[in-house]
Structures are given as structure tokens and as C-alpha cells.
Swiss-Prot record:
<feature type="repeat" description="HEAT 10">
    <location>
        <begin position="446"/>
        <end position="489"/>
    </location>
</feature>
<feature type="repeat" description="HEAT 9">
    <location>
        <begin position="393"/>
        <end position="445"/>
    </location>
</feature>
<keyword id="KW-0132">Cell division</keyword>
<dbReference type="GO" id="GO:0046827">
    <property type="term" value="P:positive regulation of protein export from nucleus"/>
</dbReference>
<comment type="function">
    <text>Export receptor for importin alpha (SRP1). Mediates importin-alpha re-export from the nucleus to the cytoplasm after import substrates have been released into the nucleoplasm.</text>
</comment>
<keyword id="KW-0539">Nucleus</keyword>
<keyword id="KW-0131">Cell cycle</keyword>
<feature type="repeat" description="HEAT 7">
    <location>
        <begin position="279"/>
        <end position="323"/>
    </location>
</feature>
<dbReference type="GO" id="GO:0005635">
    <property type="term" value="C:nuclear envelope"/>
</dbReference>
<feature type="repeat" description="HEAT 14">
    <location>
        <begin position="631"/>
        <end position="674"/>
    </location>
</feature>
<feature type="short sequence motif" description="Nuclear localization signal">
    <location>
        <begin position="366"/>
        <end position="381"/>
    </location>
</feature>
<feature type="repeat" description="HEAT 13">
    <location>
        <begin position="587"/>
        <end position="630"/>
    </location>
</feature>
<keyword id="KW-0677">Repeat</keyword>
<keyword id="KW-0963">Cytoplasm</keyword>
<dbReference type="Pfam" id="PF08506">
    <property type="entry name" value="Cse1"/>
</dbReference>
<keyword id="KW-0498">Mitosis</keyword>
<dbReference type="GO" id="GO:0006611">
    <property type="term" value="P:protein export from nucleus"/>
</dbReference>
Length: 960
């Protein structure tokens, strides 16, 4: 069993920068020992240890559970007794922990519940429910927090019978004690209105009760809650207007009190009921509209109220979507009141916003551009305004234009003093001008009552070039206007703007140069149309500015090189670099060695403490772009300059970088005639089991292993470890696709004389998986694999491959799985490979015809049905939109594919077009085979086909 003192020592060292890596490695070595998880829990529970050590333990435990609780098939990885003891101890432990530790253990419990609840954790519900009481609110808070950490999993899930059964199971146990506790807490708040300590814990409990109320109702409104809607919503209505000075700190302006959090959660719940359950909630909606109005018109603009304002506005937005409630607002008087009392106060720039701009510029940008963990007032107001405008564009536009004219007049009267009025003017014009949603591709439709290009010329362009701008935020507003309406400006206008934006990369103003970088990147990603992969900007368009753009962008990053965290803080700069590289393509090859050296320097600095997954991603994308556009004869030089750093990444086990490094090395090997000498030493370590344990590694290491096999399979003198990797992948539902990808390379690229001793075992593994735990995807990939083998190794080989396991087994597999699955394959490349491989069995398979003649007619039915299908589903384009990478927010949670060096799918039949070429090939092949048979084949087979397929065959053969 792991020693508690040793584990505590390593955890204490893990929070010190100089010892963090070593201690992490030591803990990883210990985690394989029996009882390690329990030891971690005991460390977390030890009140005599420093809180920092316990928190480090809670974080490590959370990640340990994510890594080690179950495999990809849901089987426990820990010993059974460890599993049971952890589940027994973790609930009472979490209940007793302080808030910051509860959060981490709550996530661990949620992970455990994902795999084990309810079937493998049947005692959980009764254990939780039995701990609830009317008097011990501290315990109640802990119990409810545990429950919420489990039940919040339901919120994003798709409806299913299994999910509803789980929810019903919980409701049957929880609803009665839950509602009783809600009423008790309400009563005790009233009874303790002058007792600050009691009020604080009671409101803590009330907050979690509201979150659970949402959990219980997130999928559908249960009958119990429908029956008790007056009770529950009556209590919540009461607390939206509740005030008590004991719950507020007048000196606190930034952080929301528990009372504000309670009101915000109520508004979130009320929005759910308005959106989803208006049929039962309708009679109460007007009461909540009134109280929300009172709230919004009475609370101050202090940041601590931002979350409440945002949630309240989101509720009003949901109300506005319902026509009968919109009519409350659909008149000039009401709309003026909304404008003056709600929208304008909440979109006007505050001193706190200006301070954020100056003191924490990257956070200002994230809030402005993306929103943040707590939604901004401006974002919520914009959503509300957009909904009002969609319902009555003329009324809303005219009312706001009248107010906006006044803002312009105030600004012009004293620009240096009244610059915020111009900021407000630009913000409101932008919000009014946009129709529909802003997608990653930008604005696609604008308000016909407004002219965005004319506004740009008159109001925006001067602020781009003026040397006497009243406040730098107006410069940012001007740049952001280009960013927002880039699709409405012509290419000629954008080309004129590019040098201006480029000059902003030389300023010291953080937000200015960052927005300039963002806007340059977005301009370079404008496509010729929404469905086109082609960009409007090409390398010729930026040839005169590419070098200076890259130089300035890289300089902005490296000026923070003293700190790995600060260096990697601003992913927008690196993303812009990547886009410039992608656009310039091969036009700056002489710069590649110098650029690569700078990126390697950045990687080396980041490696000390990887902190920003997006910055990391775009850094490696940029390296990939350079390699992709490098002439093949120059690759070895660049590889030699990278490999020392990459080998350090491996030796120091920098897991945040490893999947990227594997992809880059794989690309280099794919492009090389021989495996570079600096890469050869990786071949054997690549086969080590620990390399394949981290889920995020698997696609990349599979690609690298395939590239070794493709370029020089003799680098693996012993095939057993390679086949062991295949066995591991093919057994997994999560990685079966990678297993088939690897097997294709093994079967087609390794000399058959070397492979022959293992052929039968490969077939056994495939068939065992088919028998024991097949999935729809597995059977489809097996069908494609059969097609590939038939095409490349021959129909006779395929039959012997299966029948060597058991004579006659081929008939069962072919008839029950392959030909029934073929018509269901949607991916066009897979369909082509499988269809032509199956056809090959008929027209080139003498052994097939002699041994399995009864399969011919059913095989032909499958071929005709597939070849006649009009489906063109799911063939991926050659490009991947970079905006799809926005989800990258954490390291190691999933594989992050590098777009710049993406692997092309293997096509064994490139001469046959995946669309019309397949039908044409099938028709020609059948006609040719029929002619060789003396016109007997089709005459013989036609009566054996279904009537529908007889018609389809005739149409196919004549080219219809």
C-alpha cells in the first residue's frame, strides 16, 4: 500500500515550480500500487496537512480517477476492493471538506458516476438521502453538493430511455425529502433573519437546492414538480425580491454574494421553465417579468451584479421569443422604457471595464470576444436587443437611432471628455446592424435600414488613422468593426486596410495589437462562399507584407519570453501567425529555417510550464505549416534542427506536447524516401505499452507507426510487438478505427513471407471481436477491410484468410455481415473500397464461385443496391475550418489533430472517382465480365435478383 507520508511529500513538492515535474513523475509511478487512490483520499482528509497539499491531492485524485477508473469499454482498471472502498469513503469525505476541495472531489464523483451509477453504485442514492436532515445544514450542504455533482451530468445529454430511467430512479428517492428540505430552509431563513451565521449556511443550502431543482427538470418536467409548481416557484419568486443587509458586504464590489448567486440561479431556472414548460408555467410568467423588471431597474452597475443582470436579461430574451409575451414590449412607450432603463445603463462602458482594459487586457479581450465564465452585461443586452429587433425591426431601429443621435452630439461637444458616448454609439450601431447569428465566418446578413459600409467610411475609418484619438478604446472599437463586418467590405477595401492593421502590430497597446492580429487572421480566412473551401486571399495578395507581419507577430510573443505563462498567454497572436503562414504557402521558403528556430525557442520556453492549450496548438500548427510547404529536399535540415527539442519533450514526458510531436514526426517520415537517421531511434520505444496508455496519444502514435511501416517496415525486425499494438487497438470500441488503419498498413506493406506466421491469429482477433462485442462501426470497418483485401491481395486470399480459422466460416461472415452492411456505409471513400472489393469477389473470384456459389445472388443484390444508391454522405473536404479548433481548452482531454499536416485518407483505388466513377466502374466491370462469360452471367443472375434490383441493374448497365 502507498505510504501516506510519501504521497503527501510528493504532493507538497508538486505545487513548487522547481520540483513540480519530478514530483508528478513520482506520483505517476506510485499510482500503479494497490491502494494508491485510498491513500490520496486519506491525504485529502488530513486536516493536519497544509491546505495546499490537500488541494494538490484533490486535483491529482480527480485526474487519477479520469485516467484510471475505467478503460474505454467501461471495465474497472483498479482492483475490485479498491473500487468499492473508494466509493464507500468518497461521499462522507466530500461532505466534510471545505468548498475548494469539494469542487475537485465533486468532479471525481461525477466521473465515477458516469461509469458506475446507477447499476454499479446502487447504494449511492439511499446513502445520500439518508444523510439529509432538518437541522444539520452543514451536512445538508455537503450531501446536496455531492448530489449536484452527479445529477448535473444530465443537463447536456440527449434524451434516451436509459437516461429517463436513471432520472426516474433518482426522483423516486429524492423528490419528497428534497421539497421538504426546500420548505424547511425557507422557514428557517424567515426565523433567522437577524442571525448572520445561520443565514449564510441556509443560503448556501438554498443555492444548491436551486441547482438541483434545475438538474431534476433539465430534461423534462417531472409530474411531481408540475404538481408542486406553486410551492417551488412561489418560494423562488419570494427570493428574487428578498434583501437582507446581513448577506451583503457594502465594501465588496467585485464578487457576487450568496444572495446574488441565489437570485441568478433562480433566473436561470425560470428561463428553463419559460423556454421548455410554458404550458404549465405560463400563468406565473407575468409575475416573474414584473419582478425581473424591478430587479434590473434597481440594482447598481457594480461588477458583483453582472451575473444577475445577465441571467435576468436572458430570461427576458426567452420571454420575448414567445409572441404573446413580446406584445407587452411591442409599443413605442414600452420600447423606450426598455432602452432607457435597461439596455443603455447596461451597455455603457463602466470605469471597471476601463480598468480591466488597462490592468488585465487579455481578460478584457476574452470577455469582449468570446464571453467568459460569467456572461457580460453587454452580451446579454445584445441578445435581448437582437430578439426585440427580430420581432419588430423598424420600431426598435428607429428608437435606438434617436437615442444614438444624442450620443454623437454629446461626443462631438467634447470628445476627450465624452469619448464613452462614441464607444456606446459604435456598439449599438453594430448590435442593430447585425441580422441573425454571428458565426465563425462572420456576419452574413445586415439590417436593411442601416448602411454598414457608409458608417465605416464616416465614423470608423478616421479613428484608424487619427493621431489624436480621445481614448485608445475607440481605436479598438474601429479595429473590431472591421473584424465584425469583414464580409461586408470588398476585397479591395480589405487590401487597403491590411497595411494599417499591420502597423498596429508595432504598438505597445496590448488590446490594439491583439485585435489587429485577430482581424488580420479573420480577413485571411474569408472564403469565396459559405460552402467553398477556397479563400479570397492568396499568397500573391500578401507577398509584400508577409515577412513583416510574421516578424512583428513573433516579436510580440517573444518579448514576454522570460515567463512561460506570459509567453503563452495570447493565443490570438500565434493563431494569426499560423494563418499568415497558411496563406503565404511556399512563397517564403528562405525564411523557414529562421522561423522554425523561433518556434522551437517558443516550444522550449513553454515546456517549462505548459499553460495555454490553444497557444500550444497554434504553435505546433505553425511548425506543421512550415514543414508542409517546405521542398522535400530541404526537410532533413529542418528535421535535424527540431529533433533535439522533440527528444527532450519525450525524455521529460511533457504530455501536453507529445501528441503534436508524434504528428509532426509522422508527417516527416511520410514525406521521406527513407526514415531520417535522427528519427530511427524512436521506432522501438514507440512500441512500449506506456506510450499507448494516454488517450490523446493514440491517433498520433498510430499515424507514426503506420508511417514507419510505409517507409521502411524492416525497421521492425520483430513483428510481434507491432501486432500486439493492433490487438490492443482492435479490442477497443474507442480505438477500433485506428486498429483497422494500422492493420491495413500491416497487411499491404509488410512482406507477406514475414507476415504469414501471424495471419491466422489476425483473423482470429477480428472474428473474436465480431462475435463478442461488435458495434455498427466495427462491422462497417470490417466490411471495408474485406473490400481492401479483396482489391489488393485477391479474392482467394480473403477466403483463405477467414476459412483458415474454421473451414466454411467465410460463408457465415460474408452472408450475415459483409453484404448486409455494404449498402449502409455512408462515407464515400469507404463505400468505394468496400463495393469494388465485393464486386471483385464475383468477377475475379473463381474460388468464390466454386466454393460458395450460393452467395453469388445475394452478393449481387448487395452490389446493385449499393451502386444504385444516390447517397453522397460524409466525404470530408480536404480542409478543416480552423474555427472548429475553438473547443481546445484543456490539455490531454482529447486528441487535437494538426490541420496543417493532416493525414490524407488511404485510397487504394485513386483512379476511380468516389462519386460517379464508382457507378461507371461497376457497370463497365459487369458488362466486361458478362462478355467474357459469353453473355451467360447476367442472364443467369438476373432471375435470382429481387424485382427492384433487376430494374436497377438494367439502369446501371445502360448508364442511368
Amino acid at each position: 500500500m502507498s505510504d501516506l507520508e510519501t504521497v503527501a511529500k510528493f504532493l507538497a513538492e508538486s505545487v513548487i515550480a522547481s520540483t513540480a515535474k519530478t514530483s508528478e513523475r513520482n506520483l505517476r509511478q506510485l499510482e500503479t500500487q494497490d491502494g494508491f487512490g485510498l491513500t490520496l483520499l486519506h491525504v485529502i482528509a488530513s486536516t493536519n496537512l497544509p491546505l495546499s497539499t490537500r488541494l494538490a491531492g484533490a486535483l491529482f485524485f480527480k485526474n487519477f480517477i479520469k485516467r484510471k477508473w475505467v478503460d474505454e469499454n467501461g471495465n474497472h482498471l483498479l482492483p475490485a476492493n479498491n473500487v468499492e472502498l473508494i466509493k464507500k469513503e468518497i461521499v462522507p469525505l466530500m461532505i466534510s471538506l471545505p468548498n475548494n476541495l469539494q469542487v475537485q472531489i465533486g468532479e471525481a464523483i461525477s466521473s465515477i458516476a458516469d461509469s458506475d451509477f446507477p447499476d454499479r453504485w446502487p447504494t449511492l442514492l439511499s446513502d445520500l438521502a439518508s444523510r439529509l436532515s432538518n437541522d444539520d445544514m452543514v451536512t445538508n450542504k455537503g450531501v446536496l453538493t455531492v448530489a449536484h455533482s452527479i445529477f448535473k451530468r444530465w443537463r447536456p445529454l440527449f434524451r434516451s430511455d436509459e437516461l429517463f430511467l436513471e432520472i426516474k430512479l433518482v426522483l423516486d428517492v429524492f423528490t419528497a425529502p428534497f421539497l421538504n428540505l426546500l420548505k424547511t430552509v425557507d422557514e428557517q431563513i424567515t426565523a433567522n433573519e437577524n442571525n448572520k451565521a445561520s443565514l449564510n449556511i441556509l443560503f448556501d443550502v438554498l443555492l444548491v437546492l436551486i441547482k438541483l431543482y434545475y438538474d431534476f427538470n433539465c430534461q423534462d418536467i417531472p409530474e411531481f414538480f408540475e404538481d408542486n409548481i406553486q410551492v417551488g416557484m412561489g418560494i423562488f419568486h419570494k427570493y428574487l425580491s428578498y434583501s437582507n443587509p446581513l448577506l451583503e458586504d457594502p465594501d465588496e464590489t467585485e464578487h457576487a454574494s450568496v444572495l446574488i448567486k441565489v437570485k441568478s440561479s433562480i433566473q436561470e431556472l425560470v428561463q428553463l421553465y419559460t423556454t421548455r414548460y410554458e404550458d404549465v408555467f405560463g400563468p406565473m410568467i407575468n409575475e416573474f417579468i414584473q419582478i425581473t423588471w424591478n430587479l434590473l431597474t434597481s440594482i447598481s452597475n457594480q461588477p458583483k451584479y453582472d451575473i444577475l443582470v445577465s441571467k435576468s436579461l436572458s430570461f427576458l430574451t426567452a420571454v420575448t421569443r414567445i409572441p404573446k409575451y413580446f406584445e407587452i414590449f411591442n409599443n413605442e412607450s414600452a420600447m423606450n422604457n426598455i432602452t432607457e432603463q435597461i439596455i443603455l445603463p447596461n451597455v455603457t462602458l463602466r470605469e471597471e471595464d476601463v480598468e480591466l482594459f488597462e490592468d488585465d487586457p487579455i481578460e478584457y479581450i476574452r470577455r469582449d470576444l468570446e464571453g467568459s465564465d460569467t456572461d457580460t452585461r453587454r452580451r446579454a443586452c445584445t441578445d435581448f436587443l437582437k430578439e426585440l429587433k427580430e420581432k419588430n425591426e423598424v420600431l426598435v431601429t428607429n428608437i435606438f437611432l434617436a437615442h444614438m443621435k444624442g450620443f454623437v452630439d454629446q461626443y462631438m461637444s467634447d470628445p476627450s471628455k465624452n469619448w464613452k458616448f462614441k464607444d456606446l454609439y459604435i456598439y449599438l450601431f453594430t448590435a442593430l446592424a447585425i441580422n441573425g447569428n454571428i458565426t465563425n465566418a462572420g456576419v452574413s446578413s445586415t439590417n436593411n435600414l442601416l448602411n454598414v459600409v457608409d458608417f465605416f467610411t464616416k465614423e470608423i475609418a478616421p479613428d484608424l488613422t487619427s493621431n489624436n484619438i480621445p481614448h485608445i478604446i475607440l481605436r479598438v472599437d474601429a479595429i473590431k468593426y472591421i473584424y465584425t463586418f469583414r464580409n461586408q467590405l470588398t476585397k479591395a477595401q480589405l487590401i487597403e486596410l491590411m497595411p494599417i492593421l499591420a502597423t498596429f502590430l508595432q504598438t505597445d497597446e496590448y488590446v490594439v495589437y491583439t485585435y489587429a492580429a485577430i482581424t488580420i487572421e479573420k480577413i485571411l480566412t474569408i472564403r469565396e462562399s459559405n460552402t467553398s473551401p477556397a479563400f479570397i486571399f492568396h499568397k500573391e495578395d500578401i507577398s509584400n507584407s508577409t515577412e513583416i507581419l510574421l516578424k512583428n507577430l513573433i516579436a510580440l510573443i517573444l518579448k514576454h519570453g522570460s515567463s512561460p505563462e506570459k509567453l503563452a498567454e495570447n493565443e490570438f497572436l500565434m493563431r494569426s501567425i499560423f494563418r499568415v503562414l497558411q496563406t503565404s504557402e511556399d512563397s517564403i521558403q528562405p525564411l523557414f529555417p529562421q522561423l522554425l528556430a523561433q518556434f522551437i525557442e517558443i516550444v522550449t520556453i513553454m515546456a517549462k510550464n505548459p499553460s495555454n492549450p490553444r497557444f500550444t496548438h497554434y504553435t505546433f500548427e505553425s511548425i506543421g505549416a512550415i514543414l508542409n510547404y517546405t521542398q522535400r529536399q530541404n526537410l532533413p535540415l529542418l528535421v535535424d534542427s527540431m529533433m533535439p527539442t522533440f527528444l527532450t519533450v519525450f525524455s521529460e514526458d511533457i504530455q501536453e506536447f507529445i501528441p503534436y510531436v508524434f504528428q509532426i514526426i509522422a508527417f516527416v517520415v511520410e514525406q521521406s524516401a527513407t526514415i531520417p537517421e535522427s528519427i530511427k531511434p524512436l521506432a522501438q520505444p514507440l512500441l512500449a505499452p506506456n506510450v499507448w496508455e494516454l488517450k490523446g496519444n493514440i491517433p498520433a502514435v498510430t499515424r507514426l507507426l503506420k508511417s514507419f511501416i510505409k517507409t521502411d517496415s524492416s525497421i521492425f525486425p520483430d513483428l510481434v510487438p507491432v501486432l500486439g499494438i493492433f490487438q490492443r487497438l482492435i479490442a477497443s470500441k474507442a480505438y477500433e478505427v485506428h486498429g483497422f488503419d494500422l492493420l491495413e498498413h500491416i497487411m499491404l506493406l509488410i512482406d507477406m513471407n514475414r507476415l504469414r506466421p501471424y495471419i491466422k491469429q489476425i483473423a482470429v482477433l477480428l472474428l473474436q471481436r465480431l462475435q463478442n462485442s461488435k458495434t455498427e462501426r466495427y462491422v462497417k470497418k470490417l466490411t471495408v477491410f474485406f473490400g481492401l483485401i479483396s482489391n489488393k491481395l485477391g479474392s482467394d486470399f480473403l477466403i483463405h484468410f477467414i476459412d483458415e480459422v474454421q473451414d466454411g466460416l467465410f460463408q457465415q461472415i460474408w452472408g450475415n455481415f459483409i453484404i448486409t452492411t455494404l449498402p449502409t456505409i455512408g462515407n464515400l471513400l469507404d463505400r468505394k473500397i468496400a463495393l469494388i472489393g465485393v464486386l471483385n469477389m464475383v468477377i475475379n473470384g473463381q474460388f468464390f464461385q466454386s466454393k460458395y456459389p450460393t452467395l453469388i445472388s445475394s452478393t449481387m443484390n448487395s452490389i446493385i443496391e449499393t451502386a444504385s444508391s444516390q447517397s453522397i454522405a460524409n466525404l470530408k473536404n480536404d480542409y478543416v475550418d480552423l474555427d472548429n479548433l475553438e473547443e481546445i481548452s484543456t490539455f490531454g482531454s482529447h486528441f487535437s489533430k494538426l490541420v496543417s499536416i493532416s493525414e490524407k485518407p488511404f485510397d487504394p483505388l485513386p483512379e476511380i472517382d468516389v462519386n460517379n466513377g464508382v457507378r461507371l466502374y461497376v457497370a463497365e466491370a459487369l458488362n466486361k465480365y458478362n462478355a467474357i462469360s459469353g453473355n451467360t452471367f447476367l442472364n443467369t443472375i438476373l432471375p435470382q435478383l429481387t424485382q427492384e434490383n433487376q430494374v436497377k441493374l438494367n439502369q446501371l448497365l445502360v448508364g442511368n
